[in-house]
């Protein structure tokens, strides 16, 4: 009688642990897709060991000031910029087909979408008045996304040329 009681208790405990394990796995999978990004901060934009690439050149001067370097989900780099006077932008780079867009990037339909060439590169510019604006381009197997969540009027268009012509990503060696 005592042996069967222990057997039943062991089965109940096993069932509870199994249900808890399934719930943890399901919740963890949902958490990974809820918009939260795993970010690792770097001192410079060289993501060679983890991401397999480095940002070899990007704009940096008295009005375009990089201040933080990230690797997102081990595959997308992001450089945060202060744009004088008092604005912020971010530049994301990734191997072609691996770009991760910021949370809420496509939440609103873009009011204006244009394509144009800069230095032989096709650039897609998207913007909403007073909300998000971005430019996207592809060069040598890498994708580039320059965006601002709170842009100033025509800021993205004014910064497109220096970013498209001066930003390069290359494989890490």
Mark where each language-model region is.
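Feature marks short, highly hydrophobic, charge-poor N-terminal signal-anchor/signal peptide-like helices
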Residues: 1-12
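Juxtamembrane cytosolic interface motif at the C-terminal end of transmembrane helices
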Residues: 21-29
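Core hydrophobic alpha-helical transmembrane segments of single-pass membrane proteins
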Residues: 11-21
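Short, solvent-exposed recognition patches
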Residues: 30-134, 138-139
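Surface-exposed amphipathic alpha-helical segments
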Residues: 140-173
């Amino acid at each position: 009688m005592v042996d069967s009681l222990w057997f039943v208790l062991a089965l109940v405990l096993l069932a509870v642990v199994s249900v808890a394990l399934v719930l943890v796995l399901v919740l963890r999978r949902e958490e990974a897709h809820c918009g939260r990004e795993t970010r690792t901060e770097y001192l410079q934009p060289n993501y060679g060991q983890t991401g397999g690439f480095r940002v070899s050149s990007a704009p940096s001067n008295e009005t375009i000031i990089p201040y933080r370097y990230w690797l997102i989900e081990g595959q997308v780099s992001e450089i945060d910029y202060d744009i004088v006077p008092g604005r912020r932008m971010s530049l994301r780079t990734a191997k072609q087909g691996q770009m991760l867009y910021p949370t809420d990037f496509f939440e609103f339909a873009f009011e204006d979408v244009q394509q144009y060439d800069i230095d032989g590169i096709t650039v897609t510019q998207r913007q909403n008045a007073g909300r998000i604006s971005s430019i996207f381009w592809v060069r040598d197997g890498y994708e580039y996304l320059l965006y601002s969540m709170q842009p100033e009027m025509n800021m993205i268009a004014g910064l497109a040329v220096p970013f498209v012509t001066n930003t390069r990503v290359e494989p890490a060696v």
